[in-house]
Amino acid sequence: KPDYAEAYSNMGVALKDQGKLEEAIAAYNKALAIKPDYAEAYSNMGVALKDQGKLEEAIAAYNKALAIKPDYAEAHLNLSFELLSSDRLKEGLEEYEWRWKTTKNVETKRQFSKPLWDGKKNLKGKKILLWCEQGVGDTVNWSSRLPLILSLTDYCTLECQEKLVPLLTQSFPNVEIKAQDRRHDSLRDDFDFHMPMGSLYKHFIPEISQNTKPDAFLTPDPVRIKFWRKRLESLGNGPFIGVSWKSSNISPQRLPNYAPLSEWSPIFTIPGVTLVSLQYTDFHDDLTEIKNKFGVSVHNFDDLDHYNNLEDVAALCAALDLVVSTTSTVPLISAGVGTVTKLANWRQ
């Protein structure tokens, strides 16, 4: 069936996932030649163009999809990412609200009887509930702006992933930090307004624009920082550099962010430093490969649960001189505690 537009679009998705971006775009164009009003093909093409670094062309493709299908939530969400990457903050954050209408997220939105805060209602004397969405790293990132909410109210509760409770409690003593609990959402009466954390930025665009890089906002236990400094000194001489080369979440979409270990040679071969692993999953074989390939040891503290004990991970990061990492929770924590952090952005 040579005029099967959907097959060409599906082929494009498969080619894109294999990193064959030019071939993927050619497949999408074939689909559109057959079916010019094919919104999904335009949106898929936008993703491939984005992966090529062609942000303006990607934005144009998403807008074509939306001209055909104005309520296409996935295209709105994809558009939001490219607008934000293009520093079009206000437009991008408005489009980001469409995330709740996508197939992936529609079931995860919490349903309360209390109203969503619109950014305009006076919060003086009122209590607001902020609730986490998506991953641990997102929660850490968004928590950097909690002081903006605290400038409007003295009564703020944040419900987050359980393993973040100790670290965020230590860092934000004026916020009630609790593990998320969705069991009785519709019956709750312990707050006046609520808001998902991903909507926080939208209501503070002027403040964020003036201060795009907030100061250290995470506060690990000073006793644990001192403990980890002594542990580091037992390994050898500094500077002590923490490294993390992959995430536990490696989907086809995220795979381009994570380079093979061979690409890390400029870091692993720095002379006169002590390297420390900040990996939290599937890394023991990697440590052996690094030793065999580069003749260097990346030290790992086996008694530290990097995945769950984030309070101690933050303390270790604070004790380090530098962190080099790919996109994951690690650089958000290390930058959050004020340690110089370099992000290895392979996709770009």
Identify the meaning behind each predicted range.
Residues 1-348:
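Alpha-helical solenoid repeat scaffolds of the TPR/TPR-like class and their adjacent stem/linker regions
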